[in-house]
Amino acid sequence: MRVEYFEDTDTLQITFKEGTVVDTRDLDENTLVEMDADGQLVAITIEHAQERTDLESFLYKKHRGAAA
């Protein structure tokens, strides 16, 4: 998984897995969902990210432990 922010275009891209994108769907006018040939999610692209997300406080926590 990879999260990238492109400051010059104010675009946030979250890539969930590597793969060839064969279908891109508009979730709304500023959000694209990219799918592979099996219909699995590859990435989400968010335009105008600064006004639509809280980029300044973005962080994640990785949890490790026994599966429930």
Give residue spans per PLM region.
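Small, basic N-terminal interaction modules of short regulatory proteins
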Residues: 1-68
